Amino acid sequence: MEGKEEDVNVGANKFPERQPIGTAAQTESKDYKEPPPAPFFEPGELKSWSFYRAGIAEFIATFLFLYVTVLTVMGVKRAPNMCASVGIQGIAWAFGGMIFALVYCTAGISGGHINPAVTFGLFLARKLSLTRALFYIVMQCLGAICGAGVVKGFQPGLYQTNGGGANVVAHGYTKGSGLGAEIVGTFVLVYTVFSATDAKRSARDSHVPILAPLPIGFAVFLVHLATIPITGTGINPARSLGAAIIYNKDHAWDDHWIFWVGPFIGAALAALYHQIVIRAIPFKSKT
């Protein structure tokens, strides 16, 4: 097809590429048309170079995300006092800023998920196939492990003594509080992703798709400000897994299930809310 990159055409399957972030579903007259749902399982994707390129993009993005953010956490932990470091606000900015930058960089390649919870939510909304969702999640987790591993390689002593950036439920909070914080925090993030990338909004003349990463990164920043004191803020199972594996202390694993169950529940609720309540897709008449 003219105008497409050559590597996308190599082994491409009969279904068009679906990039949930930063793409617009529109006609020449800007009339809105509901995009078709992704197939549940599409083995044909395994023959497409663009499929593997997207997975590599998710790996590199999550690697860079963990590298920068865990280094920031280590810098705050090693400081003699909060005034000598960027503090909680700086950590929140590092997480939110990296998501903004990385989503901007990878949106046109993989959709810029960088988070298994985001991938799961978009899968439930039929924005991508199970094949692609599982591949993304594996690559995200591998990237997170490598990113945290590089940080430990640079400063192994400080990494181990300062917690390795691992997520744990803070003293004074119950497991239920930690789980609730992760559910609500992930709901905020995934709901923002759906709203910022909504195909109907993208069809409007006034919408600027390139700005989609901005509210997503800002949502990550705000959630971190709210929940760092409770759980250190997970809302990203790959981020939590990478830090836990490299740090590998018992207390990092005690509550680890919270940082998978909470984000997946939050993502599922956000997907259901956006698709059923906000967009009312199941209730729309078929034409």
Swiss-Prot record:
PROSITE patterns: MIP
Gene3D superfamilies: Glycerol uptake facilitator protein
Transmembrane segments annotated in the record for this chain: 56-76, 93-113, 134-154, 176-196, 210-230, 258-278
A Pfam family matched in the record: MIP
GO molecular function, one term: water channel activity
UniProt motif NPA 1: location: 115-117
Residue numbers on the Cytoplasmic membrane side: 1-55, 114-133, 197-209, 279-287
Alphabetically ordered keywords of this record: Acetylation, Cell membrane, Membrane, Phosphoprotein, Repeat, Transmembrane, Transmembrane helix, Transport
Extracellular topology ranges: 77-92, 155-175, 231-257
Comment field on protein domains: Aquaporins contain two tandem repeats each containing three membrane-spanning domains and a pore-forming loop with the signature motif Asn-Pro-Ala (NPA).
Function: Aquaporins facilitate the transport of water and small neutral solutes across cell membranes.
Protein's UniProt name: Probable aquaporin PIP1-5
UniProt organism field: Arabidopsis thaliana (Mouse-ear cress)
